[in-house]
């Protein structure tokens, strides 16, 4: 890379970073986080966005920025998700392997990561190493080690980052934070937190009784045909190899097994 190209790249990152920081302040008006960090009003320039994970939360995040930014890249291991997203963004490049997205890193400014939990850190790390701003769905990582690696990479990249926690970016949550930070309720000495659900081992009858989505039993010993259009190997990514089973996918079932998800706390 020539000196001129380096300066041009640095200038581009600086402009985009300032815009990201500006939109962070605006994000409080949104009830749902989506990539609120990207939604700015009255800003002429548009960001070029790469979306990694286009189904589920990824589809919601894509919809949240599609009207204000340029969607230039779409990636999903499920061709069904990818096809639906691409039908609304026919000019975007499409990939099933997120690693290939960064072969064209010069084409986008920021990345939205909405893959399954066990690959969040890997896609985020690739984005940071390429100097891209990142909005990543919760949880940011799957282990303490991954979190430390991401923290170090973010410090080096000096780009804007945000982790998506949806409603926590809403105006009421931000108002409460401001009240606490200004000392309106005095020193905070204790915090009581509870959740109303837990993904323990359940029989189908127990799951039905508690209105749960799916029962959680011992890991299946058999396999199911891999759905057409799903690249199961890429879906597994860094996780141990497992035969496909319908109990894992589709839907919010996979996160009840540690190699892919983090259980109840990561789903709140």
Language-model segments: which ranges?
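N-terminal Rossmann-like dinucleotide-binding module
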Residues: 23-89, 167-170
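Predominantly a Rossmann-like dinucleotide-binding segment in NAD(P)-dependent oxidoreductases
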Residues: 53, 57, 157-162, 167-268
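Conserved SAM-binding strand-loop segment of SAM-dependent methyltransferases
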Residues: 93-97
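Short amphipathic alpha-helix with an adjacent loop that forms part of the alpha/beta core around
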Residues: 100-106
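N-terminal Rossmann-like NAD(P) cofactor-binding module of classical short-chain dehydrogenase/reductase
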Residues: 111-112
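Beta-strand-loop-alpha-helix segment that lines the small-molecule cofactor/substrate pocket
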Residues: 116-117, 121-169, 176, 183
């Amino acid at each position: 890379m020539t000196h001129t190209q380096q300066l041009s790249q640095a200038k581009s990152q600086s402009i985009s970073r300032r815009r990201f920081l500006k939109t962070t302040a605006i994000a409080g008006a949104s009830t749902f986080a989506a990539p609120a960090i990207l939604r700015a009003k009255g800003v002429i320039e548009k960001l070029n966005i790469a979306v990694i994970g286009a189904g589920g939360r990824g589809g919601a995040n894509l919809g949240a920025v599609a009207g204000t930014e340029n969607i230039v890249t779409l990636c999903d291991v499920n061709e069904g998700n990818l096809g639906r997203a691409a039908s609304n963004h026919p000019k975007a490049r499409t990939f099933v392997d997120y690693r290939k997205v960064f072969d064209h890193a010069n084409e986008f400014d920021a990345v939205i990561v909405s893959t399954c939990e066990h690959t969040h850190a890997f896609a985020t790390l690739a984005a940071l190493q390429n100097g891209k701003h990142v909005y990543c769905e919760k949880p940011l990582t799957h282990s303490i080690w991954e979190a430390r690696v991401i923290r170090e990479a973010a410090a080096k990249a000096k780009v804007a980052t945000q982790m998506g926690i949806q409603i926590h970016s809403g105006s009421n949550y931000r108002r409460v934070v401001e009240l606490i930070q200004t000392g309106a309720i005095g020193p905070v000495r204790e915090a009581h937190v509870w959740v109303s659900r837990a993904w323990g081992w359940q029989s189908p009858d127990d799951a039905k009784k508690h209105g749960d989505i799916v029962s959680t039993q011992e890991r299946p010993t058999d396999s199911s045909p891999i759905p057409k259009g799903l690249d199961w190997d890429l879906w597994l990514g860094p996780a141990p190899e497992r035969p496909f089973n319908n109990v894992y996918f589709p839907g919010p079932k996979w996160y009840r097994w540690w190699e892919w998800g983090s259980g109840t706390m990561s789903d709140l």
